[in-house]
Amino acid sequence: KNRLLFPIIFAFIFSACSDFSGNEDEVEASLKPVAKQKKKVEEEATRTYYDLNGITFGNNTFVAVGEKGTVRTSSDNGATWDNGTRGTTSELNEIAYGDSTFVAVGERGTHLYSRDDGTTWDNGTWSDDDHVTGVAFGSNSFIGVSSTYLTKSTDNGSNWVRGCSGVRVYDMAFGNNKFVGSGAEGAIQISDNGSGCSTPSGSGSRTTEETLYGITFGNNRFLTVGSDGWLSITGDNGNNFTALTIPTGANHLYSTAYGNNIFVAVGSKSVVVSDNDFSEDPILKANSYTFNDVTFGNGVFVAVGNDEIIYTSTDGDDWTKVHGK
């Protein structure tokens, strides 16, 4: 009897061990996603997130710029983001696209340009070290803005010259063959090409003493946004502005963009949406987000903020976080 039992017991043990050995790979494989996710969480918890100040769209690519020369790019409508090579360690304030070129401007007179969709950057030739806060493209020229003068490049960012002086604008937009800038104490500047500037001549040219941080062009109108939720529009290329009703609860607005037949303005815990003809008062859609800049492309609004936060929306109402802390 014992001789018969031994082979049976041995066969049972061998079979059990074989089953366990065969499952080792399966067990290890099942643990890998958990370990991978844990590693990703740990990396995200310890990595440094930089503030993003500006964003634009061109050549089916979103490019965002910010603190310490940070560059982030997306070619899938904002779903995923890659790191561009930093062309500087200076703060980058704003970015624009035109003629197959991205141009970013910032502190200490920084003027950078990229011709490969934000992957690599070169320094434009510029001698001054004033802070440049905005940039726009139009009439085959890039125009940068500072608190005292404009800068201008006609060779896609390679070389820059000083434009008109005495301006006090923070941002600029191009439309109807005009550059219109907005800035301190309701200041508005109009220029054909950045070399010469004029102040609006209309009786409604200066409607506020509020600081106008952002401006955009859409549906044949310029829209400015600023401190304390200020919004104003012009349909005559900047000569006369009309103040809009400030939405209840709106705070400082820093940027605005046009797309999908609406204007979207973003700022300090404020997202404001207006229809394209301003037949109704602007509406505060969200008061939990703080964004520094917003742009539109491929049917999507993309907004950026501190700690590298990036959100997307199609209507300015519902926002999805796609990147950041």
Protein language model regions, located:
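Bacterial N-terminal signal peptides that target proteins for export
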Residues: 1-6
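Flanking scaffold residues of small Cys/His-coordinated metal-binding clusters
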Residues: 9
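C-terminal motif of bacterial Sec signal peptides marking the signal peptidase cleavage site
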Residues: 15-16
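Short, conserved catalytic or interaction motifs in soluble domains
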Residues: 19
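Residue-level hotspots at or immediately adjacent to binding/recognition sites across diverse folds
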Residues: 29-325
